[in-house]
């Protein structure tokens, strides 16, 4: 699946279509390259995952790397250069591939606290950049028109809000599920205690046990 997606992304016609629009360039092409990276590392053997985990405690290193890549690639000048320079385009795609792999290997290990810290930095940055694209009276990217720039800004603000809501829903679901499991465990422990007490009382009144 990962190799098929990579092959598709390397098709010149698709690449040209994705980069012809500023919002498709950032909102579609970026996530697709990251998805390919995530799929590539999905089948890593346990030994390789353990080796990566040595320098990626709690997913911090991977998430910092992912955040750095995305922050750099949101700079308008980088988008312009990627369109006219093949080495920079290749570096951009490789960085997104690695960012997707790092995100896949780091997200679950990070836990809710580190995830919240990561999203608490990335999502406001996305929203601020998006609002700047919307409000700017000047073209920030020479290769794209002003209305396309504003459209990208709207997409970034919407995506940041949607990701924030989605993660908060996940947190609420996890907390509710944890509380339900705790209540079930407490109820099971209480039932086991009652059964044990009933067994002791039954043995105490059993003549054969008394004798």
What are these regions (language model features)?
Residues 1-211:
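Alpha-helical membrane segments of multi-pass proteins
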């Amino acid at each position: 699946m990962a190799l098929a997606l990579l092959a598709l992304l390397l098709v010149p016609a698709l690449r040209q279509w994705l980069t012809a629009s500023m919002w498709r360039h950032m909102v579609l092409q970026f996530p697709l390259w990251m998805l390919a990276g995530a799929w590539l590392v999905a089948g890593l053997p346990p030994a390789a995952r353990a080796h990566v985990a040595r320098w990626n405690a709690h997913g911090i290193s991977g998430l910092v790397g992912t955040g750095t890549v995305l922050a750099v690639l949101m700079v308008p000048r980088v988008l312009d250069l990627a369109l006219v320079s093949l080495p920079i385009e290749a570096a951009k795609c490789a960085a997104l591939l690695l960012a997707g792999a790092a995100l896949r290997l780091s997200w679950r290990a990070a836990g809710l606290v580190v995830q919240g810290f990561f999203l608490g930095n990335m999502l406001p940055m996305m929203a601020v950049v998006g609002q700047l694209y919307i409000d700017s009276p000047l073209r920030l990217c020479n290769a794209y028109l002003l209305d396309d720039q504003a459209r990208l800004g709207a997409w970034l603000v919407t995506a940041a809000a949607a990701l924030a809501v989605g993660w908060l829903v996940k947190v609420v679901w996890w907390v509710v599920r944890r509380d339900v499991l705790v209540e079930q465990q407490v109820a099971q422990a209480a039932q086991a205690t009652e059964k044990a007490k009933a067994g002791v009382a039954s043995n105490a009144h059993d003549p054969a046990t008394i004798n």
